[in-house]
Regions:
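Short, well-ordered beta-strand elements
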Residues: 113-117
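A conserved amphipathic terminal alpha-helix motif
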Residues: 119-149
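Hydrophobic-ligand binding "helix-grip"
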Residues: 50-52, 61, 65-108, 118-120, ...
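Structured surface interface patches that mediate subunit assembly and partner/cofactor docking
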Residues: 11, 41-47, 51, 136-138, ...
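Short beta-edge strand/loop motif at the mouth of beta-sheet-based domains
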Residues: 16, 23, 34-71, 81-83
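Solvent-exposed alpha-helix faces
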Residues: 33-34, 140
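Short acidic N-proximal helix/loop "leader" segments that mark the beginning
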Residues: 1-14
Length: 149
């Protein structure tokens, strides 16, 4: 039997997104932690609360109760209010390693949030496109939270 390995470009993923919000760095960073944690949402806006322990080595996970759940990653670096970096499989239940970086920067009109998600793994067909569509939804929730305050 002959097996053909996928090309390297089929094993990697890079998603970069930016959003500007009319809010301070500190308020925006707090909103990001809230929206990634207890106020997180899944498909179609369904509540999907997560726990994000905001310190180096802290876990980002979904607690399903009775010692069940999903580990999405660990906080690799946090520098309030300008950086949150997480490594782990995130929402993917297959052989993958991800690095997720949120960088926040003060700009004239408020705060610029830059997301960079890089991953290496055995992605099922269509998965890359689905991942790229999810991150803007989180950004929209952060924007609504800080601009309504």
């Amino acid at each position: 039997m002959t097996a053909i390995a996928p090309a390297i470009e089929n094993l990697s993923l890079t998603v970069t997104e930016e959003i500007r919000v009319r809010s301070s760095l500190a308020t925006t960073f707090a909103a990001l932690l809230e929206e990634m944690g207890p106020s997180n949402e899944g498909h179609n806006g369904a509540p999907m609360p997560m726990t994000l322990e905001p310190w180096p080595g802290g876990r980002w996970f979904r607690d399903l109760g009775d010692n069940n759940g999903h580990l999405w990653g660990h906080v690799q670096a946090i520098k309030r209010p300008t950086l949150l970096e997480i490594t782990g499989p995130l929402m993917m239940s297959f052989a993958v390693a991800s690095n997720l970086q949120y960088r926040l920067k003060e700009v004239d009109s408020g705060t610029l949030i830059t997301l960079r998600h890089t991953a290496l793994g055995l992605f099922p067909d269509g998965y890359r496109d689905a991942l790229a569509q999810g991150w803007p939804l989180l950004f929209d929730r952060v924007r609504r939270r800080v601009e309504q305050a």
